[in-house]
């Protein structure tokens, strides 16, 4: 038996986070879920848009993460927007607490993915972008796309 192919196990992404924030550092965290939520997330029914994480009483919770109810879940389904606990080591929580104590920093979930059969969250320490930063990023992306297009044309001949 060979090893399984390394494939993309990303279940949900927060694309808006990279547009609205500068991501300073990322952390990997486990997430406490019930069975029907895991099935729903594996089915691609999770939405990280407008979600954030907060630290309370030495624990980290992700808020506003929408997980649609599992279709065959019946009474076992939970509230789609409930707060879910993130599983981190105490030293990691203290590091995050140090970051968020600074003015302008927040915790944003960047993606949900599978690792060894477990759902993990990529948690980013983020600082908000101003409107001119967003415009600069869009202009740089457009310039790069034009350069790549021209290079492709030149390489054909």
Curated annotation (Swiss-Prot):
Its main location: cytoplasm. GO terms for biological process: trans-translation. Belongs to the SmpB family. GO terms for cellular component: cytosol. GO terms for molecular function: RNA binding. It is found in: Cytoplasm. SUPFAM superfamilies: Small protein B (SmpB). This is SsrA-binding protein. It comes from Clostridium novyi (strain NT).
